[in-house]
């Protein structure tokens, strides 16, 4: 009978999906609405938002294959993972402060690129976290499921603050600042178990010729 209980390393890997999914959900539900509220009157909000998404995708397409290849070498995977998480979290936390569309879009693009970049290294860590190859699918499915469930908690808290904050003297701008901070803290906190408990055991040795 196959072992179904997850190890500390496997649980730590799963938890990062709980953390980053909070930003994914916020990006799809609240961020476009908030962006429309700070965009200049008469501007094409849909076009601007579409450009931002396109730019983020292009940057990711250009950078991630290179970084992914570099991360295969000993000691690099966690460094790149931590760098993308930290930059992404900082940009997420700052999203509530710009009052104009362009600074907001710049922060959003960087946060989105870093989120997706961290996912490249996160997925690469699966082979290091799983106890054996035959557990890869099981651990991955737990990550997907718990990511979906866990992302709802900070999102619901953020939604309540944004929608009902006026009852407590909190306007939408302040509510969104709080929502971005909640999401950033959640994202960062759930990255820590992976950083602490999952180590790169599958890697290429640097032969010094690069």
Positions of the model-derived regions?
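C-terminal ends and interior cores of transmembrane alpha-helices
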Residues: 61, 81-102
């Amino acid at each position: 009978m196959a072992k179904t209980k997850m190890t500390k390393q496997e649980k730590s890997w799963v938890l990062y999906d709980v953390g980053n999914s909070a930003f994914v959900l916020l990006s799809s539900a609240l961020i476009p609405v908030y962006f429309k509220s700070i965009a200049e009157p008469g501007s094409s909000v849909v076009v601007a938002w579409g450009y931002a998404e396109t730019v983020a995708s292009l940057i990711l397409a250009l950078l991630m294959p290179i970084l992914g290849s570099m991360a295969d070498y000993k000691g690099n995977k966690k460094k790149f993972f931590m760098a993308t998480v930290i930059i992404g979290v900082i940009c997420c936390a700052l999203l509530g402060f710009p009052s104009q569309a362009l600074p907001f879009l710049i922060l959003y693009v960087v946060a989105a690129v870093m989120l997706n970049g961290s996912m490249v290294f996160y997925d690469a860590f699966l082979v290091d976290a799983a106890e054996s190859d035959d557990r890869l699918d099981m651990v991955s499915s737990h990550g997907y499921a718990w990511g979906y469930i866990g992302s709802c908690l900070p999102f619901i808290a953020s939604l309540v603050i944004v929608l009902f904050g006026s009852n407590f003297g909190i306007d939408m701008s302040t509510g969104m600042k709080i929502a971005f901070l909640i999401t950033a803290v959640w994202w960062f906190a759930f990255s820590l178990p992976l950083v602490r408990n999952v180590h790169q055991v599958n890697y290429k040795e640097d032969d010094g010729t690069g």
